[in-house]
From Swiss-Prot:
It is found in: Secreted. It comes from Streptomyces violaceus (Streptomyces venezuelae). Keywords: Biotin, Secreted, Signal. GO terms for molecular function: biotin binding. InterPro entries: Avidin, Avidin-like_CS, Avidin-like_sf, Avidin/str, Avidin/Streptavidin-rel. Biotin binds at Y67, Y78, W116, W132, W144. This is Streptavidin-V1.
Length: 183
């Protein structure tokens, strides 16, 4: 009797396992979605002014990398850290993300930080659309003017010199405090 009960349980568990595997839809697998977001976000990105954003997206939602500004007096690369939605919606929405750069490296300290917040939109013309806040350390009396606001669009295609000049002439602002401090 005991062998019959054990055999019946084993058959039941096998049936449940096979049924679950057969009914799983791989296109709805959240791990597949995470991999797609990771693969899409990871890489080298350029904004409209030619600044370079090199990022790695971790499976846990972490963003790590460097940012090199093409404007102002920023020298070399600055470390960035951030987060992204590692389980993005599957309805075609963008993937929410954000990162911060403290404008201090071995060459310069601007006593400021910029945060970018936006969405990664995949596809053949992948882009990251962001809004940024640049806050500089200042006295209490000048706190009212310590934060600048702007926007950047990042693509994986480096902009041409003509495109960068057009953006500058159009008055496109940037999140580089070393440029803002000189204004």
């Amino acid at each position: 009797m005991r062998k019959i009960v054990v055999a019946a349980i084993a058959v039941s568990l096998t049936t449940v396992s096979i049924t679950a595997s057969a009914s799983a839809d791989p296109s709805k697998d959240s791990k597949a979605q995470v991999s797609a977001a990771e693969a899409g976000i990871t890489g080298t990105w350029y904004n409209q002014l030619g600044s370079t954003f090199i990022v790695t997206a971790g499976a846990d939602g972490a963003l790590t990398g460097t940012y090199e500004s093409a404007v102002g007096n920023a020298e070399s690369r600055y470390v960035l850290t951030g987060r992204y939605d590692s389980a993005p919606a599957t309805d075609g929405s963008g993937t929410a993300l954000g990162w911060t750069v403290a404008w201090k490296n071995n060459y310069r300290n601007a006593h400021s930080a910029t945060t970018w917040s936006g969405q990664y939109v995949g596809g053949t013309e992948a882009r990251i659309n962001t809004q940024w806040l640049l806050t500089s350390g200042t006295t209490e009396a000048n706190a009212w003017k310590s934060t600048l606001v702007g926007h950047d669009t990042f693509t994986k295609v480096k902009p041409s010199a003509a495109s960068i000049d057009a953006a500058k002439k159009a008055g496109v602002n940037n999140g580089n405090p070393l440029d803002a401090v000189q204004q």
